[in-house]
Curated annotation (Swiss-Prot):
Residues 80-255 are annotated as: Disordered. The lineage of its organism: Eukaryota, Metazoa, Chordata, Craniata, Vertebrata. A zinc finger (C2H2-type) spans 258-281, 285-307, 312-335, 342-364, 370-392, 398-420, 426-448, 454-476, 482-505. Its main location: nucleus. GO terms for molecular function: DNA-binding transcription activator activity, RNA polymerase II-specific; DNA-binding transcription factor activity, RNA polymerase II-specific; RNA polymerase II cis-regulatory region sequence-specific DNA binding; zinc ion binding. Keywords: DNA-binding, Metal-binding, Nucleus, Repeat, Transcription, Transcription regulation, Zinc, Zinc-finger. It comes from Xenopus laevis. The gene is znf652-a. This is Zinc finger protein 652-A. It is found in: Nucleus. Residues 101-127, 167-186 have a biased composition (Acidic residues). Residues 82-100, 150-166, 240-255 have a biased composition (Basic and acidic residues). Belongs to the krueppel C2H2-type zinc-finger protein family.
Amino acid sequence: MGQTANSCQKMLDGRPADVSGMVVNDPCLMNIPTSFYHSTNQELDLSNKTFKREVGGPFSVMMENKMGKPHLLETDQQNFFRDSKPINEVHSVKGERENSGESEEEEDDDDDDDDEDDEEGEEDEDEVNYKREQIIVEVNLNNQTLNVSKGDKGVAQDSSHIKTSSDDEEGDSGEDDQDSHEDEENNPLPLDGQTNMQHGNQDQKTENSDMVGGDGTIPANSTKELGKGGEAPKRKKKTPKEPKSPSDKAKSEEKETLTCDKCPRVFNTRWYLEKHMNVTHRRMQICDKCGKKFVLESELSLHLQTDCEKNIQCITCNKTFKKLWSLHEHIKIVHGYAEKKFSCEICEKKFYTMAHVRKHLVAHTKDMPFTCETCGKSFKRSMSLKVHSLQHSGEKPFRCENCDERFQYKYQLRSHMSIHIGHKQFMCQWCGKDFNMKQYFDEHMKTHTGEKPFICEICGKSFTSRPNMKRHRRTHTGEKPYPCDVCGMRFRFSNMLKAHKEKCFRVTSPVGVPPALQIALGNPTLSNPSQGVTHLPTAHVPPPSPTPPLNLNVLNTLPPRPIPHPFSHLHLHPHSHTHHLAVPPVPHLPPPPALFKSEALNHRGHNDDSFLRHLAEKTSASQHH
């Protein structure tokens, strides 16, 4: 290592004059000690010396590039290697380097700093500069051509000059070699308008090679610069196309966009549109049952399985569905395999699906947007209006599949199906009780489980269903929401109103018949109705008037009527009237009012008003005669 350091020191001391000139000219390098520069004369003869090598080359020496500048100390250590060459070529390279010393002094200061950082790299660059290929450029102005060819490899004195064959070329080839060297290093200006190929570093060479095409020709823009003063005719430039106006563009777009009438596809040309129409829409797959059209056979088959027919059937109740998910919902809800996981936020009522919750939320709103056009009644849901409209139209959309009987409401069909099945649709497994609606079935099942989730807020009593709790709450509030249409009496429960109508308005006897006629009906042996009142005092008896006998043969043939009402004996027995009435009834006077406002029915189920009116008219006519 000591020998290596000494040899490097000597090599730096023997540095050529061009490097020393750079040191003198550059004020930034005045402080660098000269002990780092050595001449390389002693290192030329390397036959008897050995160095520590990193690679197989004879001049591969590892050396440190630590300099005096602080910015150079920051760089990392790098190993520089010299290309392996025969020893006899080293002397020629050195001589050429000394001859070119004057030209190297005129380089820029920036290049000097880069060369000082990398000393061995500078020597390699010098060797590369002398290895440049000879380029021959031939210019023919008559034919307006420019031919570029490469000469023999090697370093020659004539390599600095470019041979050109031009009629307008002036005699500039007589310049000195020194001028040629200066032209190489200082990038001279073009001579008489002709482009000169410059011999610089590798970057300049690559730039020139990019200017030259792969076939050895230079682009046309460089040849146009060669001809001046009308020596060669210029090529005509292609006139650029005028840009289309917006209206023209809109017209072209309208022409290009052709839309299919049967599908949303868009085409650029009419040919593609006609092809699309022939292939797609003229070979449509048509459903034989509903008439729908499909492009593909797979779409038609899927339509036949799902939408066209109800082919998906429930195994338990044989109900058919269009969609598979509808069957799943049916199995979960109807057959009791699902749980009510979704609850209403307002009333906490639970449902099977969230869709049912959304439908239920309408019940909490006061809006009734659906109004019947016939009677003006409003509803919250469209389905409620649809069911209500069946009352006006008389339509019966629900048909029994077993006997083809039709019904107006669905619950009626459920009740009817129990005839064919033998029991109602929902049957309790504990007690055997069956129900037509699942709502009632669920309420009944809570009686077996003991579940009573609905609690009264006033007394704390619990109930199995919400309607039962609401009915119980009326006992606390005193509310009576069920009024009687006849007498105006109000009731707390609907069953109480029903019982009130059955007891008070079910009268089967003719209430408007006079008592004299009732006596004749009870005792047919009496021919004169005045005989029935002979025991009354004379003061109150009016003068007798002859009355013709009534033909009551039809009345005698009537069967006896039942008397279920407890107050009906007041109208049939005459002694009750004699005790209360001071004046006996007169046959031609209107009958007394009934205890209750009702309509009497005869044995045929018709009103008795017409019969009584006929009797009154007949008696009045006989009196006038």
